[in-house]
Curated annotation (Swiss-Prot):
Pfam families, A to Z: bPH_8
Protein known as: UPF0457 protein BC_3525
Organism: Bacillus cereus (strain ATCC 14579 / DSM 31 / CCUG 7414 / JCM 2152 / NBRC 15305 / NCIMB 9373 / NCTC 2599 / NRRL B-3711)
InterPro entries, per database record: PH_SunI-like
Recorded family membership: Belongs to the UPF0457 family.
Source taxon at top rank: Bacteria
Length: 84
């Protein structure tokens, strides 16, 4: 599987990409937005998931502890999974 897979349960958001799996408790999520920057947010400590090259969309997930940028070409499906 090349793309990012996002699954939402009652308590957490599970992001899978290649061999990595990241679990984010829903209570920690502050905001989910589209990121308009080229390389993903300007912050250095953001966790970048996916390949930055060859993708057209970036989704920023802000949480209490850490921020995440998802590099994708399937923005609609990922946002639908997050907001489901």
């Amino acid at each position: 599987m090349l793309g990012i897979n996002v699954k939402k349960t009652n308590e957490e958001l599970i992001i899978s990409w290649q061999l990595a799996e990241i679990t984010i408790p829903l209570r920690d999520v502050i905001e989910v937005t589209e990121d308009a920057t080229y390389a993903g947010v300007e912050e250095v400590d953001v966790i970048r998931i996916g390949t930055a090259y060859g993708t057209t969309d970036r989704i920023l997930i802000k949480t209490v502890k850490q921020n995440y940028v998802l590099f994708t070409t399937n923005k609609v499906a990922i946002l639908n999974a997050i907001h489901a």
